Amino acid sequence: MPFLVACGAGTTDIDGSSTVFPITEAMVEDWGDSIGGSARLVIGISGTGGGFKKFCSGDADINDASRPIKASEVERCAENGGEFIELPVAIDGLTVGVNPDNDFVQCLTLEELHTMWAPESEGEIKRWNQVRSSWPDERLQLYGPGVDSGTFDYFTETVNGEAQSSRGDFTSSERDNVLVVGIAGDRGSLGYFGYSYFVENQDILKMVAIDSGNGCVFPTDETINNGTYAPLSRPLFIYVSKESWAEQDVKNFVSYYVSYERAGLLRDLGFVPFPEQVHDLVLDRFQRGLVGTIFGGERPQEGTVEEILSANQ
């Protein structure tokens, strides 16, 4: 169901990532309160990929995205004559969680995650002791985002080497709260989702540390921001239609959204804000209406978010 914040003459349609949704929802509510409810914004959740389909077809003004835009999506937008402004808004860490009654999993290597989630593991890896022999011979039940989710794309590329490359026999949903409820109710479960959903549900889930070669690291504000939780930390984005950018309500709302003054709100939601200078670069990019992708497409640029933004202002 879409989320409607306020009433007015114009409508701004926002769709996309379930991971970014809580940020956008909170920004819409805060901004709506600050202007006395004189604008109308409707938010849906179609997943990052599903949102880009609507966005590039002209059916959404803003797309929430938990990954950068793909080359095929850039092409689809171009075919429909749509330009866009790409704005990183926060940092997230993909969090692996298990049922709180699981007393044997404390840390997983990337290779063990691959063993669980590889396409060739479908129908084959079904017990915990198949992942690590010292673990009990108990059923392994996997939960994850749907294939239209940017979280699914990012996780599969990081763990399996190719986006969308995954076993298919897992319980999937575009709504992270469905995954949380499933894991919380199943002792043999494991799943992944954005860091904020763990923070919100840490009383009913158990977080697993990840060893990417330098020891076991839990996702925290500090490890996500300083890079020690890499490669499972990532920037989150909103994409704004250049046509919609010309509308004053959109300019005002997005300027409010990306300002460093919202850093406290991001922390309250379980996300990690960028340093102030990065938020300033993002705001400048939006206010100048700089179009195109510098983080995605055929040739994504390398470096930190700040380095990439600074080189393209």
Predicted feature descriptions by range:
Residues 7-313:
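Flexible loop/hinge segments at secondary-structure junctions
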